[in-house]
Amino acid sequence: MELKLLQDNGQIGAGVDASPEVFGRDYNEALVHQIVVAYQANARSGNRKQKDREEVKHTTKKPWRQKGTGRARAGMSSSPLWRGGGRIFPNSPEENFTQKVNKKMFRAGMRSIYSQLAREGRINVVDGFTVDAPKTKLLADKFKAMGLDSVLIITDSLDENLYLASRNLPHVAVVEPRQADPLSLVHYKKVLVTKAAVAQIEELLK
């Protein structure tokens, strides 16, 4: 199969041969959903803290005697049943959100994403993608000429000028094939891949 070549002026050029094993697979929506959710879950870190009955500030004095008042027995005011008491199952920053995804499943999901991008015309090949200086304006002008606004660039080797120029653009990311993740691939409107990076992607996902 072929991937369309995108020129610097935004015009579509001749096709570039690509492996149908990576870019011609059927779309498995359930698998893609699973690996995207797992990727987001694995990026989470615990940032919530609630106190249990041992941690809330309280007195250990018994609120009233055990028998004879007609009220339900109570041991201390830190009980989770009381207003201001501790939580029974409190949130903790040590919570583990990790979801395991097997290598075969991950590769199959990535192949499915790349294939769907190719079908939708959201992935294009470029001969190379560089800027002369680490200036955001140079890169912004280049994207404007190409008619692009939300772009993920997958390059075979990270160019320092390109990386520095892209950091201040809100909808642009530059990665190497090994760093491409399922969330970024589905998030950006357009994915640009250098010719050498296509071969690296095929090698990673074969």
From Swiss-Prot:
Q: Which SUPFAM superfamilies match?
A: Ribosomal protein L4
Q: Name one GO molecular function term.
A: rRNA binding
Q: Which Pfam families match?
A: Ribosomal_L4
Q: Where is the composition biased (Basic and acidic residues)?
A: 49-58
Q: Is NAD a UniProt keyword of this protein?
A: no
Q: Keyword set for this entry?
A: Ribonucleoprotein, Ribosomal protein, RNA-binding, rRNA-binding
Name one cellular component (GO) term: ribosome
What ranges does the record give for the region Disordered, renumbered to this chain? 43-94
Membrane-crossing ranges are none
Q: Name one GO biological process term.
A: translation
Compositional bias of kind Basic residues = 59-70
The record describes the protein's role as:
One of the primary rRNA binding proteins, this protein initially binds near the 5'-end of the 23S rRNA. It is important during the early stages of 50S assembly. It makes multiple contacts with different domains of the 23S rRNA in the assembled 50S subunit and ribosome.
Cite the record's note on assembly.
Part of the 50S ribosomal subunit.
PANTHER family annotated for this entry?
50S RIBOSOMAL PROTEIN L4 (PTHR10746), LARGE RIBOSOMAL SUBUNIT PROTEIN UL4M (PTHR10746:SF6)
Q: Which family does it belong to?
A: Belongs to the universal ribosomal protein uL4 family.
Q: Which HAMAP family match?
A: Ribosomal_uL4_B (MF_01328_B)
- By what name is this protein known? Large ribosomal subunit protein uL4
Q: Which organism was this protein described from?
A: Cupriavidus necator (strain ATCC 17699 / DSM 428 / KCTC 22496 / NCIMB 10442 / H16 / Stanier 337)
Which lineage?
Bacteria, Pseudomonadati, Pseudomonadota, Betaproteobacteria, Burkholderiales
Which gene is the coding source of this polypeptide chain?
rplD
